[in-house]
């Protein structure tokens, strides 16, 4: 597999050893978070993104290897697999080139060329292709027999054979492919019979659209493909025909004459009928794959920022799911998110609002509420304005994305079988304020609403990427072994749903964990799983203080040696800058433990179990604006980032319609990625630059802001 290591290393700008060691660790069953955190010496301190890229490329290599074996078996069955051909196949690591090699041997439906061969026209095709015969029509007369009635039919059949030979020429296919790489244009046209339909207007920007394929960004390409799938657009990928046919004719035409003319016609036929449709499909697929990859990257970044959003922590919360006609669903939760109270409070009308405020105030006093969570759906702004009149209690607006999915789920029904799903939704909103990560892992990541075109991309790849992101975030934060739900534990490195259930069952039967060593008593949780999960599980007030840190149990002896050298207990070493400064890390370097791990341990001992998530901040919309009619160009307003795409960021400014900051308006400098400037749910200050009342669109800017 050495050659595969070289290819992966070169494509990712890594060393061959890094790739080899990482693949070995993955093959041994270690998870990406575990490898990134606890095997830095083996990988050369690769991060999770790099390890995931190696894993992805290694899987592609395995698939390519399987394809090679299938191709060799198929050609061998035809008794055409020569040693040279086998070596050529084995040396090829490009999927398109491999299929080009296989093309002449690939079983295919009965083609025009096969019919011509069955009619005995292959010798005539070879004569014409040699281009030495001056009178091919006369030679064609010798082939008039059976199904061939005229010399013209014989020549036509011979040209079909020549066209197929040309179309299976891997060098020619690569030349055409290179032209497409450089020059391909993507064109979309409206389907005339449907252009007046209301739904078609969503794609009006692409009714007559042309752009170089290599410059067509992912959101445009996905929008075009969505319009095509819906039946409103006709889409093609094309190049100037002459650029390709000239290259083909340059190789196959020698001199002048009737044979040369026939070969020239066969070249054009080969391109138009056989090569172009195949290469166009190939580029349609590869451009869609590239757009999917870019879009999935945007979705995973959005999800990561949602999962790692600032938690309120263990405080008593009143959560409100706003409603106008049906009233607000109100719940009160204790510090652990347990339900204390639920009711409905109506807020429509001045007198009702006065009564509602009194009801809200009573609940906050009765249940000692420390914070209020308001869902960001219908009537959110109006409800928030009422709740802000509560003295001394911060009010936070919380995204409702996915709350309705959770409230209707089997898990929610099991926990609250007697409650209406709207009440369950309000509970989810409150818990999301307390700990976004712990609550969001309960629902399918795709339900959270992570991107505009998430339903247009490859769903298998999207699920893999989102699941990997959830796993990464859960392990980055760490999990309280004694309070975590099954859903949260399931994403811990080495566990999964089955072992997570066993941990919860053990907790119910034996009470809280007091040591990581107790993991070995959990049913079916063996040494391998224990090794992978232990470092990511936290036990507050454990017998061993290291059990509430990210220090892995396999490194406890090392920390104990550090403490012994400082003449103190491990508990005295933790959080003591003076003692930690005195430790000479170089003295503890071994063949297995290098400076990367030692630095991580020291950092963890300084602040054990430090939550990497930022501090939660209260936010207020501008009191001057409540609807789009209140806006005017030039207004400067506070807002919250609600979604990030590769073309910009959507901002909630409190008018029931998000505004868009185009990527060109995000900064005073050129940027490639909006994530360089903004993060999901970040509080920003924006300027209104355009308002389209008819289409309900608001254009915003963050350029030229005063520092």
Predicted regions: what they are:
Residues 539-707:
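Single-stranded RNA-binding regions, centering on S1/OB-family and related RNA-binding modules
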Residues 50-52, 60, 64-74, 78-319, ...:
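Duplex nucleic acid-engaging cores and interfaces of nucleic-acid transaction enzymes
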Residues 1-20, 27:
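Generic start-of-chain signal for non-secretory N-termini
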Residues 74, 88, 99-101, 229-240, ...:
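Structured, non-catalytic alpha/beta "coupling" segments that mediate domain-domain communication
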Residues 38-40, 129, 240, 322, ...:
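Short, ordered loop/turn segments at secondary-structure junctions
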Residues 178-185, 320-324, 377-382, 398-405, ...:
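A glycine-rich phosphate-binding loop feature that marks nucleotide/adenosyl-phosphate handling sites
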